Amino acid sequence: MCIGPLKKICHWGPLTALGIIKIITLITIHCSRQWWPPQESFWATANFCFFFFFSGSTLFHFISAIFEGPGFLPLKWKPEKATDAQFLQYCTVCQGYKAPRSHHCRKCGLCVMKMDHHCPWINNCVGHHNHGHFTAFLASAVGGCFISTVILIAWVVTVLSLKPIPFPPPSVFTLILVIFTIGLSIGVVLTVGMLLYFQMISIIKNKTEIEDWISEKAYHRRFGTDEKFIHPYSKGWLFNMRQVFTWDCSPVGDGINWPVIDGCDQYTLTKEQLAQKMDKRRRARRYRIIKPSSGSWLPIQHGWGVLCHPPYTDETRIKLDVTDIVIVTRWRRYWLFGEKEQKAIIDFPIKRVRGWFPRPCAIELIESNQYTLTSSKSD
């Protein structure tokens, strides 16, 4: 069953989301028909249809976001002008250049057009092609669950009141199931509503989650100077929203060439990324592994400090052996982030080994900053 197109569905994220959608929809329809039967009046029918619309819209846009996908760059992609390659980062995994706004997703294994983030609930990235569907899914889920919460709470109040009810008394199991569903609905309204809020801010600014991080680093790079970094893709909130919201949620543009504001060009952001990469290389330090790292997320053998202070990220924890050399670019009190130094093999792409490992496993070797990190996706 989990082959071909269905492979994207067979994952804990989509299956959990589909289960929540199904439970909320079925229980709400059941309670709505008892509390306010649609045949009773025009407004009762409108209430029933309104919820049904949101439920159907949630399911449609959810499935569309999964199967439409974010849009991936072709393998070994190159810009039309060979001279433009100097402004782009090279992806060793895809063996091609990354177009403006594109980033490599280690979970999808490809470079994603206008990558925002990898969402476990759709088991896919949110990017250029499915950004509209994903946002519509969030909005529909929040709207539908808000209506569901009102209907279910009204049903419970009616059942628990001392007045006669116009439908058969529910069993204890049914009452518990409805209260559980209320919790699910409220949880969706709060959590998905917060995600929808951040997505709308991102769309209004025309700045993805990754680009927001790049802009923040660009600000700190220029701190104390008169130079300012201007995000090149924000051309006003209305224009920005039209780039994502269309009648059929289809993407605008080819995902490679983007409208930019006056004074910027297609490579304004990529040039900034390259400059940040150079700064990162200058800060890099070499560490030698003195204790093996198992790659475990719960490395209790390295002490309670390491165990209780993990990096709050889903980035890889890497396995390392004694005498391995790691180029470290990020530091925490109990953890280090770096890339394992490997020997290059001619005509054979190296699979990069980089991620977090416990700080007690390594000691710094030298203070030199002359290191060359394999060029790939932005951190």
Q: What do these predicted regions represent?
A:
Residues 1-104, 109-118, 122-379:
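Membrane-associated feature with strongest affinity for ZDHHC
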